[in-house]
Amino acid sequence: MNIKDQYFDGERPLYESRDLRLERVTIGEGESGLKESRHILAENCRFEGMYVIWECEDVTCRNCYFASSDRAPLWYCRDLRLFDCLIDAPKAFREIDRLTLERIKITDGAEAFWYCRISEISDLQIEQATYAFMHSRDLRVSHLWLAGKYTFQYARNLEIHNAVLDTKDAFWNSEDCTIYDSEIKSEYLGWYSKNLRLVRCRISGTQPLCYAENLVLEDCSFAPDADRAFEKSSIRATILGELPSIVDPLPGSLIENR
């Protein structure tokens, strides 16, 4: 069924929809506009009510807008795909299985991407990303711009390419995460991580990469403020240029300057 140029509000206006195409539709004030729906395509739509896409399956959104009033807009879904969307809503993406994002901007990234699994993301800009990506796993992302704090904590099996990350306390207690060709500004980066691997990255911020297990750095460089690195970490590293200071890495660690 196709629905074009209509406005819906109230509670559950399109609840349990099936095989639905929405074009230039607004879901206004209310809750759970598309809850428990299946096989949905939304194009050039506007979502204003809270909890709009919850417990849904096989949903694609193109050129859509999620307003700040649409709190927690995308939770508990499977096979969710967004392209060319703007999200002003906080707490987007919670417990999503099989998530695809391309060319997305999120202006309030607080608590976004918690417990998301099997994700492919490219060209994502996320602001105010406090605690974003907590407990996410099996994530592949390229061209990420992120500003926030406490991000990627307890994340598992992440691969990130060509990112700019400005985030305090990132990757704490993470496991099996690899970052390529990225700029990372993070005080206390990667504490208590396991199998964190950084390849051709530029790192800034005090006391990076402490208490880390099996830390690997390949051709990385450090800014002058990245002091007191590697305390109590087990590490294999090749460093380009000078490293401001090192504090007591574990015995057996190998650090080579080029």
Residue ranges and their predicted role:
Residues 1-258:
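Long, distal/terminal scaffolding or interaction modules
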